[in-house]
């Protein structure tokens, strides 16, 4: 049946029996396709019936359907004509793992940062009103996890003040990655129990009204009592007191019930909350049994067992997790903060070992950072573990709440650099540029597991300002020993005997192996190269300046945007010191990159050892001749 669905119009004639059959087929399709490619399996298994109902009730794309975060949009993609492309999911040139405006007119928003859908919806509804399109509804699908983010409530405050037709579907599965926390989660949990309360009141009403003569009087009295009790106790007041109509809770796996609720909301013609209760991982036993994350995001798996088909090696995240626990065992002042992602950021084990020292603040990066400032003011040393890309959301708090007060807060930035298959909004290529303008901050980029442990310990010893460590996604390679340490930097390679000190190659973090491979290629061309790891990238250390004056050219190699990154910091430091050494930056052009594997993205950008060696050869030739001619660059430097 799924093969016959080319667009939402094909759903309109289906019977309830056919819809149930289609839902089962969609789940089977999801399990086998995502098992092959990896992706967000659990969230999509949980929204099958909800997405069917959305596309039967609303006229997409005339009525925009905006999925907050977007990782639960696979079913939406299938129902809008993209089922045949799922073999390419998250692969280079293939189907994006998130909504994509380039793929379909049904996809309005493609950023995968949470809690933004309601603001998009508010703006679209205003635009439709001002341009005379008053017959268009805007639908925002937001999870209960995203409702822990303050941006949702800023948007609700504005939406509620209007009569614009915005339908807010709360997909309540009790989780983001981990179980949803906080007061909003408690309110939603209570709302799930409301049907029994309402049913009991309705039964009592019928019995009282049946009493001869006085039944009606008693009914009116009890109704007023009920209203008073409900006004003081009913948790849907969280929404209705804002002026929002509330519908629900609705069983999110009963397509007909969801459809009835959505049609009611559509007729209302003003802002409505439709509360839909779903189960993440629905219909797939391995996901339902995964208590930690219900298979929120998976690598390729065996669909029969749910087990990964490839065993991963030691990872950066796991190395950080073990190191932090080791330091915390010795120091009771170390606490940790996560923004709803304890598992992905390596804090689950920390929380199990020190349950009173881990704070999950929900999807609230701004609050996380200022709460960390408060913890530091109280004499503790907080470690905020966060994906690099989500650090963007807390920049003002880093600057004004942490750095201004010179507070010892350590930020651990996972998934720094190119992450690959999740696309542009997950690449962590902005952090060095942002943090480079924060007064007093120290930023480290470890090259291997041993350096991660060392530099984390050094960060935890800082008591007069913020620190940050950044490392990429994936496996951590073998340790790289230093020849020596000079002025705080590790010298990893020196010019071979008989070669000049031509190039100082500054390798940032996990790009150290590439830098060593580049140096080997250049040595084979007779170019002398010194490779250093500055360890602490910001501020630029004296050792970098001391070594720079001994070389003819300085090149930085980094997995950050070249605008304002490590290369910019080094160049500025040399200028301030009046060191006249030519500098070149090799890093990420300041662009948004489509999804592909990390190695594919880097290769497309010319960030391979061969390509980098060719560029440096050209620069060295230009320094010798005064002209940087392309024919001076060998095609192959093997």
UniProtKB/Swiss-Prot annotation:
The entry's keywords: Isoprene biosynthesis, Magnesium, Metal-binding, Thiamine biosynthesis, Thiamine pyrophosphate, Transferase
Recorded GO CC terms: cytosol
Pathway annotation: Metabolic intermediate biosynthesis; 1-deoxy-D-xylulose 5-phosphate biosynthesis; 1-deoxy-D-xylulose 5-phosphate from D-glyceraldehyde 3-phosphate and pyruvate: step 1/1
Disulfide bonds: none
Note on cofactor: Binds 1 Mg(2+) ion per subunit. Binds 1 thiamine pyrophosphate per subunit.
GO biological process: 1-deoxy-D-xylulose 5-phosphate biosynthetic process; isopentenyl diphosphate biosynthetic process, methylerythritol 4-phosphate pathway; positive regulation of gene expression; terpenoid biosynthetic process; thiamine biosynthetic process
Tagged with keyword Lipid metabolism: no
Residue ranges crossing the lipid bilayer per the database entry: none
Matching Gene3D superfamilies: 3.40.50.920, 3.40.50.970
Amino acids binding thiamine diphosphate: 71, 112-114, 145-146, 173, 284, 365
Cofactor: Mg(2+); thiamine diphosphate
Self-association and partners: Homodimer.
UniProt family annotation: Belongs to the transketolase family. DXPS subfamily.
HAMAP family assigned: DXP_synth
Name this polypeptide is given: 1-deoxy-D-xylulose-5-phosphate synthase
Origin species: Mycobacterium tuberculosis (strain ATCC 25618 / H37Rv)
Gene name as annotated: dxs
């Amino acid at each position: 049946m799924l093969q016959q669905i080319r667009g939402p119009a094909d759903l309109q004639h289906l019977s309830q029996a056919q819809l149930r059959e289609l839902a089962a087929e969609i789940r089977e399709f999801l399990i086998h396709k995502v098992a092959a490619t990896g992706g967000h399996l659990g969230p999509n298994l949980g929204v099958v019936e909800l997405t069917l109902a959305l596309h039967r009730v609303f006229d997409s794309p005339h009525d925009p359907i905006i999925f907050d975060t977007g990782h639960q949009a696979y079913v939406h993609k299938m129902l809008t004509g993209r089922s045949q492309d799922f073999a390419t999911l998250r692969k280079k040139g293939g189907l994006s793992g998130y909504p994509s405006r380039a793929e379909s007119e049904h996809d309005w928003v493609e950023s995968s940062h949470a809690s933004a859908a309601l603001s998009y919806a508010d703006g679209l509804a205003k635009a439709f009103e001002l341009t005379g399109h008053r017959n268009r509804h805007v639908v925002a699908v937001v999870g209960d996890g995203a409702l822990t983010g303050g941006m949702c409530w800023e948007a609700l405050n504005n939406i509620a003040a209007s009569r614009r037709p915005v339908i807010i579907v709360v997909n309540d599965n009790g989780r983001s990655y981990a179980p949803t926390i906080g007061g909003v989660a408690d309110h939603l949990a209570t709302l799930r129990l409301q049907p029994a309360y309402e049913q009991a009141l309705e039964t009592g009403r019928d019995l009282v009204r049946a009493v001869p003569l006085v039944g009606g009087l008693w009914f009116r009295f009890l109704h007023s009592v009920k209203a008073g009790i409900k006004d003081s106790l009913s948790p849907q007041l969280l929404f209705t007191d804002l002026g929002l109509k509330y519908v629900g809770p609705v069983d999110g796996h009963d397509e007909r019930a969801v459809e009835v609720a959505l049609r009611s909301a559509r007729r209302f013609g003003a802002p409505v909350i439709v509360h839909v209760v779903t189960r993440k991982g629905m219909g797939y036993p391995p996901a339902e049994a995964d208590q930690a994350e219900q298979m929120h995001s998976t690598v390729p798996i065996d669909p029969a067992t749910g087990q990964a088909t490839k065993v991963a090696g030691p990872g950066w995240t796991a190395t950080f997790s073990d190191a932090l626990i080791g330091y915390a065992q010795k120091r009771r002042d170390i606490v940790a903060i996560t923004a709803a992602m304890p598992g992905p950021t390596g804090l689950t084990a920390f929380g199990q070992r020190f349950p009173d020292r881990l704070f999950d603040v929900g999807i609230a990066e701004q609050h996380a950072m200022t709460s960390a400032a408060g913890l530091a003011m109280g004499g503790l040393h907080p470690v905020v573990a966060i994906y690099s890309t989500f650090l963007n959301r807390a920049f003002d708090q880093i600057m004004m709440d942490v750095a201004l007060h010179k507070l010892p807060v350590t930020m651990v930035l996972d998934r720094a650099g190119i992450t690959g298959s999740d696309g542009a909004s997950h690449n962590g290529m902005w952090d060095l540029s942002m943090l480079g303008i924060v007064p007093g901050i120290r930023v480290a980029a470890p090259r291997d597991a041993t350096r991660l442990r060392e530099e984390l310990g050094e960060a935890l010893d800082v008591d007069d300002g913020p620190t940050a460590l950044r490392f990429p996604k994936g496996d951590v390679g073998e340790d790289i020993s230093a020849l020596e340490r000079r002025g705080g930097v590790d010298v990893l390679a020196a010019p071979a005997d008989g070669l000049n000190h031509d190039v100082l190659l500054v390798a940032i973090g996990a790009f150290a192996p590439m830098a060593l491979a580049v140096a080997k290629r250049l040595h084979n061309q007779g170019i002398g190269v010194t490779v250093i790891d500055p360890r602490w990238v910001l501020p630029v250390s004296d050792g970098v300046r001391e070594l720079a004056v001994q070389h003819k050219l300085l090149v930085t190699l980094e997995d950050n945007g070249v605008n304002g990154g490590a290369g910019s910091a080094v160049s500025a430091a040399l200028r301030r010191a009046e060191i006249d050494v030519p500098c070149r930056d090799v890093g990420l052009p300041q662009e948004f990159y489509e999804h592909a594997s990390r190695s594919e993205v880097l290769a497309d950008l010319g960030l391979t050892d061969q390509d980098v060696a060719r560029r440096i050869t050209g620069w060295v030739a230009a320094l010798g001749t005064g002209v940087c001619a392309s024919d001076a660059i060998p095609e192959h430097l093997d």
